[in-house]
């Protein structure tokens, strides 16, 4: 059985200028990164990192620092599967030779962590890859980028880190057994992002319960809990039915806001029927949560961008390519705020009402246990069958439905509404 160190031990190592090894969830990258504080970078630390990792050394910085240092994204559309926010690469403008040596990269990294550094002090491109960490850290995105920022901040240092993925001698990624052996050999502390999430949950609160009220609906009587997040301007609502008790085995639907489908009854998607089906299932069971996450319109691209994507779909593009054509991600949602709200409500393990496996992985990374997936039935309509096929075939949604005749592009088809 793997023995992991504590977050307190990791912070002590970071302050002492030593690296730690951080492993993420097995359902995410399932990789271990060597991480240390950027302001304490030395040629020896960088050389050690180069020797035992892929060598693609990155320097996580906060969003504010990336903006201050004029570090734009490496590409206008982030197509990285995990949403890692690479910026343009840099070298120190002065004090380096080619920029690639351990001493040169250590100098550049220290410069990135120095509050006196300005945009003109950096040359672009270079040999160090800054990463833009999500505001809110691992509570918003449980990635190594955010872990590096959280560890340095919690250790009382500048919130700027250095990281790279550990690899075996044959070039394959180190997994937990390999990481254990590596840490034992080099006397390094091994921690998990899940433990860092749990530590921050114990010591910080990122969401605020603003209001609670009785909410009678045509599905039954719920309690409505209104939340606001420190790192999210949107307001979110959780509809809770019954006593959640110990928070185990709770039926949960995390529903992304969709004005067109949920409110206007649009037939272009299946969002409205999914919301109604989830409320019905929770009401039948008499215990559960339907969490309505604001700010997720159009899988996170916003209402007007979604309408622009619809324009492209009317010319033949599918829902994925339409987003990409606009320079936007196929799916820009994160579930960090939603996970914090569920945790604040007392949910610890859940049966998740979803057809989207990525949603399960997105929630499990925040310390919540998904005990099982409950399928939401799908009834296709001529107006949304192409959308459903794309979700199934290109986005990995687990959908089974009877085929129907697709509506002509850009023309409305009169029909009965979509059922649940």
Swiss-Prot record:
Active site (catalytic residues): 331, 333
Binding site for Zn(2+): 258, 269, 271
Residue ranges of the region described as GTP cyclohydrolase II: 203-420
Family per similarity comment: In the N-terminal section; belongs to the DHBP synthase family. In the C-terminal section; belongs to the GTP cyclohydrolase II family.
Protein name stated in the entry: Riboflavin biosynthesis protein RibBA
Known role: Catalyzes the conversion of D-ribulose 5-phosphate to formate and 3,4-dihydroxy-2-butanone 4-phosphate. Catalyzes the conversion of GTP to 2,5-diamino-6-ribosylamino-4(3H)-pyrimidinone 5'-phosphate (DARP), formate and pyrophosphate.
UniProt keyword list: GTP-binding, Hydrolase, Lyase, Magnesium, Manganese, Metal-binding, Multifunctional enzyme, Nucleotide-binding, Riboflavin biosynthesis, Zinc
Lineage: Bacteria, Bacillati, Actinomycetota, Actinomycetes, Micromonosporales
Known EC number: 4.1.99.12, 3.5.4.25
Binding site for D-ribulose 5-phosphate: 28-29, 33, 141-145, 165
Organism: Salinispora arenicola (strain CNS-205)
Residues holding GTP: 253-257, 274, 297-299, 319, 354, 359
Cofactor: binding comment: Binds 2 divalent metal cations per subunit. Magnesium or manganese.
Binding sites annotated in the UniProt record for Mg(2+) 1: 29
Pathway: Cofactor biosynthesis; riboflavin biosynthesis; 2-hydroxy-3-oxobutyl phosphate from D-ribulose 5-phosphate: step 1/1; Cofactor biosynthesis; riboflavin biosynthesis; 5-amino-6-(D-ribitylamino)uracil from GTP: step 1/4
Catalytic activity line of the entry: D-ribulose 5-phosphate = (2S)-2-hydroxy-3-oxobutyl phosphate + formate + H(+); GTP + 4 H2O = 2,5-diamino-6-hydroxy-4-(5-phosphoribosylamino)-pyrimidine + formate + 2 phosphate + 3 H(+)
Required co-factors: Mg(2+); Mn(2+); Zn(2+)
Binding site for Mg(2+) 2: 29, 144
SUPFAM superfamilies for the chain: RibA-like (SSF142695), YrdC/RibB (SSF55821)
């Amino acid at each position: 059985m793997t023995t992991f160190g504590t977050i307190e031990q990791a912070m002590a190592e970071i302050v002492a200028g030593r690296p730690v090894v951080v492993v993420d969830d097995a359902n995410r990258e399932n990789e271990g990164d060597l991480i240390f504080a950027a302001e304490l970078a030395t040629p020896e630390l960088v050389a050690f990192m180069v020797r035992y990792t892929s060598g693609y050394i990155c320097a996580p910085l906060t969003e504010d620092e990336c903006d201050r240092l004029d570090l734009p994204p490496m590409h206008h559309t982030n197509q990285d599967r995990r949403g890692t926010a690479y910026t343009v690469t840099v070298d120190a403008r002065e004090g380096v030779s080619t920029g690639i040596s351990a001493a040169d990269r250590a100098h550049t990294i220290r410069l990135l962590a120095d509050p006196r550094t300005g945009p003109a002090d950096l040359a672009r491109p270079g040999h160090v890859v800054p990463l833009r960490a999500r505001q809110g850290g691992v509570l918003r995105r449980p990635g190594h980028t955010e872990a590096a920022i959280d560890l340095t901040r919690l250790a009382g240092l500048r919130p700027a880190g250095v990281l790279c993925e550990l690899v075996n001698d044959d070039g394959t990624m180190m997994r937990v057994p390999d990481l254990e052996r590596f840490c034992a050999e080099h006397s390094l502390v091994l921690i998990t992002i899940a433990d860092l999430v749990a530590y921050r949950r114990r010591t910080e609160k990122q969401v605020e319960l603003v209001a609670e009220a009785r909410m009678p609906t045509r599905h039954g009587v719920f309690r409505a809990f209104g939340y606001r997040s420190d790192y999210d301007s949107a307001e979110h609502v959780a509809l809770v039915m019954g006593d959640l008790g110990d928070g185990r085995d709770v039926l949960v639907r995390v529903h992304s806001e969709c004005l067109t489908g949920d409110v206007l009854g649009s037939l272009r998607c299946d969002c409205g029927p999914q919301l109604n089906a989830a409320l019905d299932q929770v009401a039948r069971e008499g215990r559960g949560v339907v969490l309505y996450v604001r700010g997720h319109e159009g899988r996170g691209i916003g209402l007007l961008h979604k309408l622009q994507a619809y324009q492209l779909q009317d010319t033949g593009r599918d829902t994925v390519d339409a987003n990409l054509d606009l320079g936007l991600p196929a799916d820009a949602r994160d579930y960090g705020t939603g996970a914090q709200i569920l945790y604040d409500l007392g949910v610890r393990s859940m049966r998740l009402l979803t057809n989207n496996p990525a949603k399960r992985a997105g929630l499990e990374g925040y310390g919540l246990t998904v005990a099982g997936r409950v399928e939401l039935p799908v009834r296709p309509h001529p107006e949304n069958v192409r959308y459903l096929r794309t979700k199934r075939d290109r986005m990995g949604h687990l959908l089974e439905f009877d085929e129907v005749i697709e509506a002509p592009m850009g023309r409305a088809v009169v029909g009965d509404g979509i059922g649940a």
